[in-house]
Amino acid sequence: MTPAPGSVADATGNWVDSIAPAWSRPYLRLSRLDRPIGSWLLLLPCWWSSALASVAAGERTPHLTQIVLFFVGAFALRGAGCSWNVIVVRELDGAVERTASRPIPSGQVSVAQAAAFLLVQALAGLFVLLSFNRFTVALGVASLAIVVVYPFMKRVTYWPQIVLGLAFSWGALMGWAGAFGRLDLPALLLYAGSISWVIGYDTIYAHQDREDDALIGIKSTALLFGERTKPMLAAFYGGAVVLIAAAGFLAQFSVHGGFVFAATLALFAAHLAWQIARLDIASPDNCLTVFKSNRDAGLILFAGLLLDAAMH
């Protein structure tokens, strides 16, 4: 299949290329709606946290309104974050084969147009955020500092994945705050577990570009870990499982629900172990496939939390 004009190298043949109006395609690519995996990975900690809060509150289901709001907010704010990232790193993107076709470095949109689109997406996210209680609104606003500094971290540290983890895991705090108007230890443990998960999967993602990154001075855990990537993934993924387990059991599962959660967590851990076994860091296609499978891992955990809540 011949890529559509202006399509991004690692996301060809998607709905944006095939059915979206031509004028909208650069903007949809700018917000990464041609590659929704990032929105899912931002959304899932929100859903985990909402489900965990419903367990702690003894409710059978999370509030449907919050589930929908988090869905809309995750796609809007991930789009805004991606737009900001592309604006900041546009010169670096232009020097990397996989990212040179992105809308700004390829000339499909100007920086001013991208900034205007960023503002539209940010306002949509703000509209969603204002639907929550005051504590949650303040918590959401606080996350902006992390989002702003993340694109610059690739130039100064081999651990930008930690900063990404802080940003992408923020939903693990938001769901609990949305339910209770405060933060408690289960939410903090869930947040820490999600950060460890993000560091793992984004290390996998970063292996796609490690050769280009090394040439132009972009740093990442993929370059730092190198051939030690698999044992390091085992450490971070293992930490994620332990921390999420602690969060779950502190949320006071029922006897039957505790069994369901333990079984679900075992499936989640098995999926992470499968990723490590399947991973071939020398193959960009393999890295992308394994990275994308984390949506399934996150949905497994969410399903288990929902089932436990329903058993109360």
Model-derived features with residue positions:
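Membrane-embedded alpha-helical segments that form the functional core of polytopic membrane enzymes
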Residues: 46-88, 98, 122-130, 137-148, ...
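Helix-loop junctions at the membrane-solvent interface of multi-pass transporters
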Residues: 51-52, 130-132, 153, 177-178, ...
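Multi-pass membrane catalytic core of lipid/isoprenoid biosynthesis enzymes
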Residues: 67-74, 90-140, 215-262, 303-304
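Intramembrane alpha-helical segments
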Residues: 28-29, 102-189, 271-280
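Cytosolic, membrane-interface loops and tails of multi-pass inner-membrane proteins
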Residues: 2-27, 82-109, 203-226, 278-286
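Extended hydrophobic alpha-helices typical of membrane-associated regions
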Residues: 20-25, 242, 246-312
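Membrane-interface helix starts
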Residues: 32-42
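Small-residue-rich segments of transmembrane alpha-helices in multi-pass membrane proteins
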Residues: 40-50, 103, 164-179, 224-227, ...
